[in-house]
Amino acid sequence: MYKSVDPSWVPLALPELTFRQRGEYWLALNPTVPAWFVTNYAGALLLQLADGSRAVADIHRLIVDFGIDIELGHVTELFESAKKSLLFSAGRQSENEWGSQQLAAVHLHLTNRCNLQCTYCFRESSPGLPIHYTADHFIDALHTMKPFATENLKITFTGGEPMMFPGFESVVEASTECGYTNLLLTNGMLISPERAEFIAQHFSSITISLDGPTEEVHSATRGRGNHKRVLQGIRRLADAGAKVHVKVTVSPDNLPYCDQVAKVLPDTVPVQFTPMMPMGRGQELHRDFIDNDAFVGLNRGLARATDGRMSTSYMPGHRSRRCHAGLFNISIADTGDVYPCHLFHQDQFKLGNIFTQPFGEIFFGEQNRSYVKTMDVEANNDICRSCEVRFLCGGGCKANTLHSIGDYRGVDRYCGYIKTTITDDLFRSCGVAVEPVDGMEVETLTGRPESTFLGMPSMASKSTGTGGGIEMTTSA
């Protein structure tokens, strides 16, 4: 049984309070905190009556006057649970002063050379590209960043194919000695049993690209003859105890096969999906981009395969105002050039060179500061500024926007997918399985509360919270 608020308590007015429906459940979302709360239709109507002047007891009397038989105790329990979920918090957070931030994540491109030549590669990697610097240069760079970094700075080793870099192991060992957390992005083609043991020892996470369950599907984008080798590399890493993830880049061609990828992998290896984007060689493949509805359908299909419960990293009361590019994250090219993001390797976004300039001047420099300032979700555009999930989304992937329309301050081309998926995730965080709906739209709770109550449907439902026709679940 929930503890109850005092009936005389007056909940804050929530002018941006939004409601979304999935089946018999309703999500109440306060975008400004952000905070959310899942209830049924009756609970949603009660929350809508909070106008900043009515006490909980007043709200109960109003309901009773309209012939709705709900006990006061059940109403006070509902508002107590919503209060604990931070739904009625003010939701204002100050930002840290520029220059006080610490480096949290680095994409380290040891080389742009690769043993594959994928059709959509955003780095346009290929086998014949040069090696620009030695292992010692990158080891020095790792030490250079340490005074500016968090205790568990994440170094993502990438390329190209990072294992084609001479001295790969030496740079990795130096990163481990610095106390950094190592992550690896690889195509999985160069995983010998011995290397699998080395990777398992030094990397906390490995992401391997696999674009289909069969050679035919996989080879359409990544070249023929390597599907079996990639699967072998995945199994070797899994057998060595490494934490392996598989990433599938989704296009209309492999979309019908995405749900089969997990079947060819060890049970311990999860699958992640990302849409093909118009970056690098992918700019030539505009016809091969999936739309928002298709990506939503894929995500929901995966949710059903896991009983509708997928993890979410959203934290009530924690605002995501922007992508972390430049603010906490940077990318270092194989030339030593520093950029805010690994998908922003363009001259206009170059912040400096780690081999020739002091890192503090690069990281705290005016160019980076100006870039980060323009990344604020409320400064980007009118659509993001007024969006109900703006502080959960943070404005989406600015690289997607940059490469799609030429302006990173615009709206992510997968805005519809992001918004729907976040809503689904909030339901799941409260233990509610999400079922598919027709299209992207969902019903909303609109109109004056008094008129809404006149058409109120049956309150009978399975209860996960209190009785009395009010159902409630929270993310806590």
Each PLM stretch: what is its role?
Residues R113-R123, A325, P340-L343, N381-A399:
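Local cysteine-cluster metal-coordination motifs and their immediate loop/turn environment
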Residues M1-L49, F66, M472-T474:
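Acidic, low-complexity/disordered tracts enriched in E/D and polar residues
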Residues E378-D424:
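Cysteine-cluster motifs in flexible loop/terminal segments that predominantly coordinate metals
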Residues A35-L108:
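Long, charge-rich, low-complexity alpha-helical segments
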Residues G99-H137, A149:
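Canonical Radical SAM [4Fe-4S] cluster-binding loop centered on the CxxxCxxC motif
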Residues M1-K3, L17, C178, H202, ...:
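Radical SAM enzyme [4Fe-4S]-AdoMet core and its adjacent flexible, acidic
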Residues F289-H318, L343-G394, C430-V437:
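C-terminal accessory region of radical SAM enzymes
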Residues P127-L185, M189-S205:
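Conserved Radical SAM active-site core
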